[in-house]
Amino acid sequence: RASKNKNEPLFILLHGAGAMGSDNLKQLFDNLPLYKQLIKTDCNILLPQAPFGSNRGEAMQNYIKSIKRLADKLPIDFDRKRIYIIGTSFGGCCVWQLIYLFPEYFAAAVPVMGSLCPDHRYEKYDFRRLVKTPIWAAHSSDDTNVRIDSDDYCAAELEKLGADIKY
């Protein structure tokens, strides 16, 4: 949805794995409560749908990079210094990856039930890359799909570095 006004922010909403597909509908329902709130404000909203099978390995990396390419090529006039990214579960994992790969691209990030390190190999990440992006992360302690310990670790590391993180 494009704003009627120029230079408004862009919100990118990323869905969970259950909304993968090619119908361009499932991701709308996955983010419906947030979408309903955002359409009351003057902003631009992008809800890309991940194709089936894009939640692992190279396919996931291709999807993640395609989100940024899509935002870069949007044919609307929006404030490129106010790009906010929000995702749940699989989408939360994508949020962590996007802000890691493109650390100064997003104005702020909200990964919900996501994981930067699903393989728990934290040593391969330089957490200093994430310090400049304000993050509000949330995770349920009884999540059975995405383990909370990755968010626990990431939040602790970022707090040590003085990052702007709420968890």
Model-identified regions with their sequence ranges:
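Alpha/beta-hydrolase fold active-site loops
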Residues: 9, 43, 82, 107, ...
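The feature captures the conserved acid-bearing segment of alpha/beta-hydrolase catalytic domains
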Residues: 108-167
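Gly/Ser-rich "nucleophile elbow"/oxyanion-hole loop immediately N-terminal to the catalytic nucleophile
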Residues: 55-89
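Cell-envelope and extracellular/periplasmic
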Residues: 14-21, 72, 88-90, 95, ...
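Active-site machinery of serine-nucleophile hydrolases
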Residues: 10, 14-65
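Proline/glycine-enriched tight loop/beta-turn segments at coil->beta junctions
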Residues: 2-10, 130-131
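Primarily recognizes the serine-hydrolase "nucleophile elbow" in alpha/beta-hydrolase
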Residues: 81-129
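Short, solvent-exposed loop/turn and secondary-structure capping segments
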Residues: 21-26, 57-58, 97-98, 121-122, ...
